[in-house]
Curated annotation (Swiss-Prot):
Organism taxonomic ancestry: Bacteria, Bacillati, Bacillota, Bacilli, Lactobacillales
Summary of subunit composition and partner proteins: Heterodimer of AddA and RexB.
Domain of life where this protein originates: Bacteria
Full protein name: ATP-dependent helicase/deoxyribonuclease subunit B
Species this protein is from: Leuconostoc citreum (strain KM20)
Bridged cysteine pairs (disulfide): none
Amino acid sequence: MSLTVYMNHGQIDMRHALLSHAHEALNQDNNLTVYYIVPNHVKFDSEVDVLRRFARLTGQNPDTSLYAQSRLQVYSLSRLTWALLKDMATMQPNVIQGTGLFIMVSDILRDYAAQLPIFARMQSKAGFVTTLVAQLVELRASRISPEDLLTILNQESDDDTFLRQTLSGKLRDLAIVADALDKKMGHTYITQQEVLSFFATQLATTQLKNVAFYFDGFNGFTSPETQVMIELMARYPVTVALLGDVEKLGSQQPGDLFYKPMTTAQRLAQFTKIANQQVVWQVPTQARCLDESIISVMSAWEKLGEYRQFNSENKKTNLAAFVAENTMVEIQEVARRIRQLLVAQPDLRLRDILILARDLTPYTGHIPEVMQQFDLPYFLDTDQKMTNHPLVELLLNLLRPAKERFQYQQVMAILKTGLLRPYTDGSLVPEGDFFDIVSYLDNYLYANQPFERTWRDLDHPFTLFTVSEDEDDEDARVVLDDKTVNRRIETLRRFVIDAFDSLQQQLNQAQTMRQAATLIILWLEKYHVTEAILSQRDTLLAAGELSRSREGEEVWEMMTQTLDDIVAIDGDERFELEKFKAILVAGFEGATFSGIPNNLDQLTISEAGIVQSNDYQYLFFIGGTRNNLPAQLKSRALINDAERLIVQPALQENSTPKYLQNTAQQQMAEENLLFYGALTAATKNIVLSYPALDAGGQISDMSPFFKRLVDAFNITVNKVTATPATSQALLKYYVGSVRSTLGELVKIAASQQQTSAYQALRNTINQSEPERLERVLSAPNYKNQTETLKPELVQALFGETLNMSISQLESYYNNPLAYFLQYGLALKERLTNRLNVAQTGTLYHAVFEGVVQQLIIQQLSLRDISQKALQQLVADNMAEITAQPAYQMLQETGKMRATQHYLAKVSEILAVNMQRAARVNHAQPKAVERLFGFPNRQSLPALVVSTPQATVHLRGKIDRLDSQDPSQVYGTIIDYKSNGKHFDWGQAYDGRQMQLLTYWQAAQLSAEQLGIEAIGGAFFAKIAPEKLTIKDFKGDVRAMLRGEIKPEQFKYRGLFISEPAYIDSLETLAEGEGSQFYQLKKKANGELYANSDVISPEDFELLLKRNLDNIQRASAAILSGDFPLSPAEGSLQFTPFTDVLRFDRALGDQYKNNTPKNKSDILKLLKADEE
């Protein structure tokens, strides 16, 4: 028996040497079976390549005839273990998965808590148990026993540093847990990482006949793999191919390029000699079929990777490098170059091209979009975690505490998986129909946020409704939607309740973990979750998504495996929901999908840390920045890097040396070898690239690995920009697929669009996709401007007669296009019934309406009743209104009931404020919520305004009308507002504030019907308190905390006529005195100050005329279909249509011209208009 080591550099065809040796051995011994071992990740590709090559060695042509071989079998080490163990006498213990270990270790931490001072504190940290499990697995795989740990602990040392003290405590706890875990596992279980160790023990007691082992593609071996190698080398012929230089064996130093494989070779030779077996060193010479440039690059890195000088007589190479603006531009440029390669070389296949990165994370979000844009099928050869799969989402949300299950986020997360669907007429509800009604239920739940109590109140069906916040009607009105939709929502509601209750019943019945696992599986089957998984699989298969189609089954298998572990290990333990869920989480977090390519010919995108085949023709190495290459590794193991430097020497002093995994620093020292392995993957050409700006927008420098090669060959690093500088540059460098090229064509400046290069590309694209070309090329000329609607469309949307509220006209002047969206197309933002500012204002509004209405019935005013009676009246109305469905959220929780109590107290304060204001005059309320322009008998006539196009009927609702004096000569209009609104002269002139003036005009037309002679004033009344953040509060904080802060001063703000009798009816003031409740103050001579809310009758007539003109202009514009994007400044802050409007001043959009706000300036404009 012997160990044969083939060693040379990456340019040499090691596989040819191994296969030639195997062929010779097979010819010499007809009974011999050769096991050819390759890394697991490249097993399939390697098997195909090995058999094709071996066929040629036997004189056959695999390209023209089928070839099979039973005496040479290609395996990964794990598959070889399985293949040989199944025929051995000793039964392999059960392999425990990570979830089983998680269960055992969790139990140990609970049972031994008093003996684990360090771990008891660390256990509260998220992920600690998982980290501890990983450390225990590493120890077991390396055959490091609790006794080994205690030996290290008991060694005398002069090191009294904090690090040593911490390590001692950690090792003591680790030894206790490891010992307890050994007892729990016994001979029944082994970890997945111990399977090779078990295989090694069986090899020591089992004699295989007529076998030889060949190892290809390895740079080193883990501790369990080394154990297998030791047993094989002691008994059978073993041949290994490793990178290195035989002549330098024994003189290699850490940091040398081939330090790891050469050290591995030495260790293997040492073990072989200990077994009294022969070691043969071979230096193969047959070169791989490589392009000269690849040979030059590999030769260069063999020196540069060790910081040695490289001098090449021939520095001409096909090595290329570029720097892109950012990661998106970089991956686009790579895709573009691949497209160009495919066109230039018709025989080239996508499977011959490899894209590598040291870390693909910055690119994973861009890859799907870019590859679709360039029409390149690809296989992303990285681990895809299971944690985001719908089945995982379903399970983890279902296993939340019962009180959380009916929350909006949880319900929608469960339903949107598509795995919990109603089952009718012998089949699941189709996905399309199901998600349609789920979207309606989503809207309802989002709007109402019902708690579990509301869910279960089946006497009150879930009815889709909207809350209107129109300025002319602030009442929340419930509007029934389509009856069919409501019925389907209610059906889905009952299905959800039934499913959740059934699950909770199962969980309540479960006394042990075994029962819980069983009942959950039964529940999933009862609600046809398995059928839903298969349905999703079939849909994905039909769409050609072969890889994704298996994901559901893989997650199900992972779940059942985890449940099996729970039953086997903790089956008789008392069921605890949180522990049960934590075990499932641990299982899913460590699980990944098995990647299966969708196509035979597709691009491979992978990471440099993953073993790759070395028969790709082209390599694109992306992301080569200083921060990514070499990788900046950090150890997350329980025994950290600093502690490993203490532990490792002690372990190697044993008679049988044992090894922990390398520290992060040791792994980083191997980055030069990892990069060399990436370079060996290509046979023709290599392209290096990196982004100037990383994914976070930070400036990136070139990787030192890249820089050494670039400098050695004097390579020009081309700069790739997101936009071609000229049309010639576009034609030369930016041509890819039709779609991608069109995306670049549209970026060309107008000055370059008449060049022959631009026209040639345009004509070429026009032949295949003329419509897309026209649409895309017109995009830069797009102006964010509206077009005038056709008359027939205007009539269809608005009718021949405009029936509208004054707030709608105001919204037109604020933002014409938003008016069209809201009132023409009837667009609405997503329904919500949260208690926002508008909702609270609506509530206050309704309360005061009810209070004043009762006073009118009793022919009283606010001043005629006591404060206590008023407060009781407010409380009664508040209770009545909050009992309505629109305010049901105020009854849902203790917090919301406290909010209701707060609103009631605020209402009382506001009512008392209005009562104090009422005591300064003799005003008497005559009407509340008085409608005009509505089609009912109680409504006052509409305000009718004629335009050349049509007649406009204006409607509205006067919140309150007071008779201001005992003679009932003057009336006063009161309009409640949630904010402290004042009369804005500039907005009134522009048509953005017409409400008071229009209500004034409408009421004046119906003065006789209202029982007054004339309207003397119209005012806004603020009915919601101002909210301040604590940082804006300027008063006494201690008084605020004691609840002693006085409420803000209540004041009516608006407009009134300068008639002395009316002014005196508001409040009788002496000369020099000011009103507390009105913006009204007299000078010493009896005249009013200019800042009073007063206007002369003459000026008021001009203002009313301007108001009518505004109504006519807006109406005419609406009926003419004129809805320009011309918002008033500040109006976009409150519109829900910003995504539709896409207003951007940087692109030329303009606000309306500002009008002066000063009263005197507006009066000058009015008089000028009149002249």
